[in-house]
């Protein structure tokens, strides 16, 4: 959080739009508390909403319309004035926002890694051949199939509590979840091991919260500015540029993860086929002192992946899933 910027006094009331899942409400409450600490006289309210993505639980995101299913209703609330800002898990935000909306604020990142959760086993390597592993993302599925072809990977939908419930009743030997969500809800003890990014590269923006507002709300952007975390923002801007450049979506196993070391931003990107048979990898580093530098780093990694044939994978998967994705 950047506390050096003194924002102007906000209005008497601000309304946060949020999904109604326990994790989403925790995130909205986290932002509400941060704003209340900055502006004690401001009454910050939360407008809970059920999105289409929360309602469709019998199919994977890649088959029902992708990440936009989690944000459309929240954007409608911004557009019609019911809410001033919307809080998102950044990995769930489409790479291209609809006209009239902007991501004004990116907050400091939680642990971006994937977590191995099981009631019987300590790690993926400990799972017997044929064990069923649940995951909600094609990215994780592709990496699991590439490194552990002896395991059976099956879809896993629902909110965090629902997914843990399916594990506890024996539907899966293990499940893979974002570590950040578990830690935010005080469920860190459910994590048996954290997956090394070398084995399971995080999704672009994983672990970070983004705040979306209507374009042109410069006053609101100024009030939110103290919550913006520059290092996290540079990292996730680079990551999202990889996906944006390649046309990534929920139909494509694509990952991008950036870290800071000695003043330089190091970015790695991956594009794979869902069966894990092809995994393309690229990486680059740059000082990335500005947003433009971070975006250029993302383009560089995307260009390396393009040279290896990434666009062939993206086009093939997008064509194959086109009709389903519009359902």
UniProtKB/Swiss-Prot annotation:
Xref: PROSITE patterns: PORPHOBILINOGEN_DEAM
GO CC terms in record: cytoplasm
InterPro entries registered for this protein in UniProt: HemC, Porphobilin_deaminase_cofac_BS, Porphobilin_deaminase_N, Porphobilinogen_deaminase_C, Porphobilinogen_deaminase_C_sf
Keyword Nucleotide-binding annotated: no
Cofactor: dipyrromethane
Modification sites for S-(dipyrrolylmethanemethyl)cysteine: 250
EC number: 2.5.1.61
Keyword annotations: Porphyrin biosynthesis, Transferase
Molecular-function annotations in GO: hydroxymethylbilane synthase activity
UniProt remark on cofactor binding: Binds 1 dipyrromethane group covalently.
Top-level enzyme category: transferase
CDD domains to which the protein is assigned, alphabetical: PBP2_EcHMBS_like
GO biological process per UniProt: protoporphyrinogen IX biosynthetic process
Cysteine disulfide links: none
Recorded catalytic activity of this chain's protein: 4 porphobilinogen + H2O = hydroxymethylbilane + 4 NH4(+)
Pfam family, one: Porphobil_deam
Protein origin, superkingdom: Bacteria
Misc: The porphobilinogen subunits are added to the dipyrromethane group.
Family: Belongs to the HMBS family.
Subunit (UniProt): Monomer.
Function: Tetrapolymerization of the monopyrrole PBG into the hydroxymethylbilane pre-uroporphyrinogen in several discrete steps.
Cited NCBIfam families: hemC
Record protein name field: Porphobilinogen deaminase
């Amino acid at each position: 959080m950047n506390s050096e910027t003194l924002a102007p006094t906000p209005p008497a009331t601000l309304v946060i739009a949020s999904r109604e899942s326990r994790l989403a409400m925790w995130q909205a409450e986290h932002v509400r508390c941060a704003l209340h600490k900055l502006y004690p006289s401001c009454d910050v309210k939360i407008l809970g909403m059920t999105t289409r993505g929360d309602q469709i639980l019998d199919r994977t995101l890649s088959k029902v319309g992708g990440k936009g299913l989690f944000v459309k209703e929240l954007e409608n609330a911004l557009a019609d004035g019911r809410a001033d800002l919307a809080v998102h898990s950044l990995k769930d935000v489409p790479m291209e926002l609809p006209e009239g909306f902007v991501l004004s604020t990116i907050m400091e990142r939680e642990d971006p890694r994937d977590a191995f959760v099981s009631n019987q086993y300590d790690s993926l390597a400990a799972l017997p051949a044929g064990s069923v592993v649940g995951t909600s993302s094609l990215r994780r599925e592709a990496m699991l199939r590439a490194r552990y072809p002896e395991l059976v990977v099956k879809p896993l939908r629902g909110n965090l509590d629902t997914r843990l419930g399916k594990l506890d009743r024996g539907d899966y030997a293990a499940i893979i979840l974002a570590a950040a969500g578990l830690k935010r809800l005080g469920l860190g003890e459910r994590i048996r091991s954290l997956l090394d990014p070398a084995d399971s590269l995080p999704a672009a923006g994983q672990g970070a919260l983004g705040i979306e507002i209507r374009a042109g709300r410069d006053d609101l952007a100024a009030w939110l500015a103290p919550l913006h975390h520059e290092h996290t923002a540079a990292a996730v801007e680079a990551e999202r540029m990889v996906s944006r450049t390649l046309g990534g979506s929920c139909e494509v196993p694509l990952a991008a993860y950036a870290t800071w070391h000695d003043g330089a931003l190091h970015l790695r990107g991956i594009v794979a086929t869902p069966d894990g048979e092809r995994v393309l990898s690229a990486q680059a580093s740059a000082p990335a002192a500005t947003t433009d530098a971070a975006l250029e780093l993302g383009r560089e990694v995307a260009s390396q992946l393009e040279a290896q044939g990434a666009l062939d994978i993206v086009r093939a998967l997008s064509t194959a899933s086109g009709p389903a994705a519009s359902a």
